[in-house]
Amino acid sequence: MSEGKNKKMNVKQISERLNKENVKKGFEYIRRNGVSRFWTLAKAKAFPAGKSYKEWYEEHCPTKEELMRQREVEFSVQPLISIVVPTYQTPIPFLKDMIDSVRKQSYEKWELCIADGSLNGDENDTKVIRVREELNRYSMEDKRIKVVYLEENQGIAENTNQALALATGEYIGLFDHDDMLTPDALYEIVKAINDYDYDVLYTDEDKISEDSHDYKKPVFKPDYSPELLCANNYITHFFVAKKSIVDRLGGFRKEYDGSQDYDFIFRCVELAKKVGHVSKVLYHWRMHGGSVAGDPTSKMYAYDAGKKAIQSHYERVGIQAYVEHMERLGLYHTEYKMIKQPLISVIIYGEDDEKKKRCSEWFKRKDYSNLEILASAGINVEEINALAEKARGSYLFFVSENLESVERDALQQMAGVLQIQNVGAVSGKVIGRKHTVEDVGVVFRTNGDL
């Protein structure tokens, strides 16, 4: 059987298993055993014993035949994609890999816009000379490659703006000077644009070793989540946006150097009507000395700029909040400021009076004082709904009698989230006695049920 048929069979098997019943089983497994064990099991299923991510990835790469077929596809919408890259004394092997990965694209309507800021006062610097020789050679070989040589290094944001000035496409893609695209990256982007008319979109990614031979640490991202984006720049690479939106932003801002892309992404999604996610690994993020991908602490200023980007986003959209670093760099915690302290009705449900009394005492000792506490006589839904009708509070907090402890500022945090426009409900994470996740929120089903 051919490799292509094997791939199709694998996709079919996965799609057959991804049904309502198995999703339900998955949530039940998490409830009983915790996320850590579930993730271990999921990895074992996805990457069988003895199979590394690299092997899995190479098995799922498009074949030469598939790439050939992609080149023959005629989309009804065929946008020119302008890929912008600021280069700075890029190691020649990385530079070649980066440019070659664009030239190998199965979707060929692109332009590569490079602003080189390698010059740092010495025109005879060997690094500068070699980079510019390579850029000259590539731009002579392929007219889709545009290069501007800057008189000095202006910083990553301003250098990127110089690359943006070269762009004439309908969409702009952000690309780092030492990373690589998969050969089907632009094809998948354009396919998604044709299918869904996205204003901005992003893809999954992984890390690539310094010698370009090993793939690791894949990041399979969720669909667009504004709240998650405010906790972590999970979008990162590969990010593509309509030029009409980019033009309205006024480019990158140098005061966010290090996280200028984070700030840029926030401002793009604020203007976008449709944000899309292409759930395929289409971008390889290079790991090497000095790269954030290799050592997070090597660029602490980047994380400080990220914190500033989130804070600025909140100010633009009218959310009163304070952002702080979490222990793991690159993750941020938001403290929402309470504009007022509305009455919260805590509705405790259960059948054990002693447990309900103990649960009630927990809430009386918390930071939030404007409370009323109501307790049901059992777990009957009608009775709980009747208490909700009776409640005087602006917010209703439903909690089981089995709750044994609550973070001191839990109500303050959750009420703060409810102040955000378009947020109608919020839920916290519930940890069981065995340190397993009992609950981590609710979702709406397509039929409207929770």
Q: What are the language-model segments listed below?
A:
Residues 100-109, 361-370:
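Short, acidic, metal-binding catalytic loop of nucleotide-sugar glycosyltransferases
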Residues 184-215, 403-447:
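Conserved donor NDP-sugar-binding/catalytic core segment of glycosyltransferases
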